């Protein structure tokens, strides 16, 4: 539908969720307040979306995003349908993406799409009459992950503003990292360190978003250079599946690891976040430290997505 502004005093009602930059800071704060209400009394929301149907169409692998959307819908009293394995769907018979979206649009009240091609979710929104939520397309956009990550910072640190952030990992191909950085540009971080091997530096459009909004940032290659300054360390895996050349991946494979040795030099209150799945970029010896907040971050995905679905569908 490629929706305009929300209504009913709710900036999300009836809207597509395609990019974190489609929303303002005040929009996100409205969402976070609703997520707080869900966390305080989830049972009060148990029948909010009874009679509504969510469709998930994932053209790339997913665990947390797909299951958390489905769990959120079920906890709200709604129902879920899933496109399932692509080789068992009509896509295997040659059905095009637009026709698949049209069918889901006929069956459901909201469509959650993940696709390897950037722009696929926006195209789906142009085809569909119902709201479309982008669960990740290409290497740039993953808006609900960014919403969750910002909400996690707000919940765990009290505010998104005034903190020093380190975003570590694959900043070239990783859409979760890119969306988080774009999301930070809507707030007032004290500083953002973009930490990556030289081959995986953040793309220019992401850095330009920080410049346009007056967010100070610096590019460094090793977390050890800045670990003592950070309030939040956001770690991502190297996106092996997005490398056009396997030899390029081999050059950077295993080039950074967050372990307990690195964290000895961290602030006492540093939190370590990760959108998951992790591979080998966070050592298991970090899990037992007070810095490790990535599993708590993942758990916050349920109330955040419950709040989002409720606001998009019902207000």
Swiss-Prot record:
Stored NCBIfam families: asp_carb_tr, PRK00856.1
PROSITE patterns tied to this protein: CARBAMOYLTRANSFERASE (PS00097)
Enzyme class, first EC level, given as a word: transferase
Binding positions (L-aspartate): 93, 175, 237
Presence of keyword Transferase: yes
An MF annotation (GO) of this entry: aspartate carbamoyltransferase activity
Cited Gene3D superfamilies: Aspartate/ornithine carbamoyltransferase
Annotated GO biological process: 'de novo' pyrimidine nucleobase biosynthetic process; 'de novo' UMP biosynthetic process; amino acid metabolic process
Protein known as: Aspartate carbamoyltransferase catalytic subunit
Assembly: Heterooligomer of catalytic and regulatory chains.
Biochemical pathway: Pyrimidine metabolism; UMP biosynthesis via de novo pathway; (S)-dihydroorotate from bicarbonate: step 2/3
Catalyzed reaction equations: carbamoyl phosphate + L-aspartate = N-carbamoyl-L-aspartate + phosphate + H(+)
Top-level taxonomic group: Archaea
Pfam families in the record: OTCace, OTCace_N
UniProt keyword list: Pyrimidine biosynthesis, Transferase
Positions with a binding annotation for carbamoyl phosphate: 64-65, 114, 142, 145, 276-277
Family the entry assigns: Belongs to the aspartate/ornithine carbamoyltransferase superfamily. ATCase family.
Cited function: Catalyzes the condensation of carbamoyl phosphate and aspartate to form carbamoyl aspartate and inorganic phosphate, the committed step in the de novo pyrimidine nucleotide biosynthesis pathway.
Documented EC number(s): 2.1.3.2
């Amino acid at each position: 539908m490629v929706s305009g502004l929300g209504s009913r005093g709710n900036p999300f009602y009836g809207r597509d969720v395609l990019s974190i930059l489609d929303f303002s800071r005040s929009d996100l704060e409205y969402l976070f307040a609703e997520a707080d209400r869900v966390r305080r009394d989830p049972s009060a929301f148990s029948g909010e979306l009874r009679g509504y149907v969510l469709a998930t169409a994932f053209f790339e692998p997913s665990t947390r995003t797909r299951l958390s959307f489905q769990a959120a819908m079920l906890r709200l009293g709604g129902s879920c349908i899933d496109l399932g394995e692509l080789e068992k769907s009509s896509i295997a018979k040659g059905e095009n993406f637009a026709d698949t979206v049209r069918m889901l649009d006929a069956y459901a009240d909201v469509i959650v799409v993940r696709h390897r091609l950037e722009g696929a979710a926006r195209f789906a929104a142009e085809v569909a009459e119902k709201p479309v939520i982008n669960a990740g397309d290409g290497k740039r956009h993953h808006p609900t992950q960014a919403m969750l990550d910002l909400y996690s910072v707000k919940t765990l640190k009290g505010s998104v503003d005034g903190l020093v952030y380190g975003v570590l990992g694959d900043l070239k191909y990783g859409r979760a990292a890119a969306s988080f950085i774009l999301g930070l540009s809507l707030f007032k971080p004290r500083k953002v360190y973009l930490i990556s091997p030289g081959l995986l530096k953040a793309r220019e459009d992401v850095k330009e978003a920080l410049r346009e909004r007056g967010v100070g940032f610096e590019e460094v290659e090793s977390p050890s250079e800045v670990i003592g300054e950070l309030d939040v360390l956001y770690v991502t895996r190297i996106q092996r599946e997005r490398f056009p050349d396997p030899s390029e991946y081999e050059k950077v494979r295993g080039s950074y690891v967050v372990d307990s040795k690195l964290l000895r030099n961290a602030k006492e209150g540093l939190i370590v976040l990760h959108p998951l799945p992790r591979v080998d970029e966070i050592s298991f010896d970090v899990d037992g430290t007070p810095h490790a907040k990535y599993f708590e971050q993942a758990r916050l995905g349920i109330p955040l997505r419950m709040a989002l679905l409720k606001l998009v569908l019902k207000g």
